[in-house]
Amino acid sequence: MNTRIERDTLGEMHVPQDKLWGAQTQRSYENFHIGTEKMPMEIIYAFALLKKAAANVNKKLGQLSAEKADAITWAANEVLAGKHDDHFPLFVWQTGSGTQSNMNMNEVLARRGNQLLQEKGLDVTIHPNDDVNRSQSSNDTFPTAMHIAAYNKLDDHLLPTLQMFKQTLHQKAKQFDDVIKLGRTHLQDATPLTLGQEISGWARMLEKTEQMIRESMIYLQELAIGGTAVGTGVNAHPKFGEMVAADIANETGKPFKSAANKFHALTSHDELVHTHGALKALAADLFKIANDIRWLASGPRGGLGELIIPANEPGSSIMPGKVNPTQSEALTMITSQVIGNDATIAFAASQGNFELNVFKPVIIYNFLQSTTLLTDGLRTFHDKCLIGLEANETIIKKHLNESLMLVTALNPHIGYENAAKIAKKAHAEGLTLKEAAMQSGLLTEEEFEKMVDPAKMVHPQG
């Protein structure tokens, strides 16, 4: 492999000739070659956006020449366009402040910026620290990138997918609004409801969690940039943080703003804990929905069999004709991972010793993983299961007609104890409720049929 010599404050490093990074990135790559988890590209792009804004503001403040600022901007735009993805090789498992990833971006933008300047015949040299990182520290840039990446991932990907999923649930609720089925509580038969009513409950769950996510995202709008090393803003213009946040807001069209207290912004990540808590709530809801569908589709002959799910693939390598609830299984595994990620994020966020939290990479890695998994899981479940979900009305009607819990409709007419006697007699002697009621001498056939009407039970009139 052809290499070139790059230098930092610790000495010389051999760097691959065709790579844009420098000595500090190379050191990190060699010192922290751990696992397979690379720094998420969402963070890389957030960094590029931040460095572009910082260069623009430094130019406005007279801290950076127009030639250097423009070259950094050009290079950052190339990164944002995905042209240099393979020049960001670092792993999540590095310094807890994310310094190596900050320097990775600084070095790539400096070298690429210098190449662009040379192409224009300009005798100007960009330095990764003095120019690209001017007025900044890893301690305020990395948390800024964390918030940008998290907010964008939620706003651009998860929330639109969640809205699509929710809309289809509403459509299914309307489609099955007239299908009266047996209700179940405690895994036991209960009074009836419509399948549409049951699904409407699922839709409302997602409406609430969507609202929780949106409300929590307000805190992610606050950016740490301008705090520099410990929150005081040393080596930065007093207006730098505010101006950079405004530039990022203008560039993205999203309501980013400068954090009111930079000391908090560097040492605490309670905003991400709070927002991920909403993601955990979404995960809990999705587990329940996927699990209900899985159980209601169980069978086809030995289970509940009230729902029919699409047959997407053979279900067994040994049992022919088997169709498994694979989309439910995938989604429930995803939600389990998200709930586990929440524990990691909460613990990591507690490690804000003095002026700086030093678990930043693992916090944002898990946050972005949760968001990606939920987005992909929602879309796949929607496309491969939810849209094609059908009601097995024959089985639904059979279960409803055999239910002893229809006896609940008799409570207002003959009292709880008499109704219970009818249910027990029917169960013990294998009778229908009507037969048990008539044999008990409590009701005539006409009275029973007037009082026990599932359609009236799902839409009571008082």
From Swiss-Prot:
Record-stated family: Belongs to the class-II fumarase/aspartase family. Fumarase subfamily.
Species annotation: Halalkalibacterium halodurans (strain ATCC BAA-125 / DSM 18197 / FERM 7344 / JCM 9153 / C-125) (Bacillus halodurans)
Gene field: fumC
Subunit structure: Homotetramer.
Protein name in UniProt: Fumarate hydratase class II
Signal peptide coordinates: none
Purpose: Involved in the TCA cycle. Catalyzes the stereospecific interconversion of fumarate to L-malate.
Gene Ontology biological process: fumarate metabolic process; malate metabolic process; tricarboxylic acid cycle
Binding-site positions, substrate: 97-99, 127-130, 137-139, 185, 317, 322-324
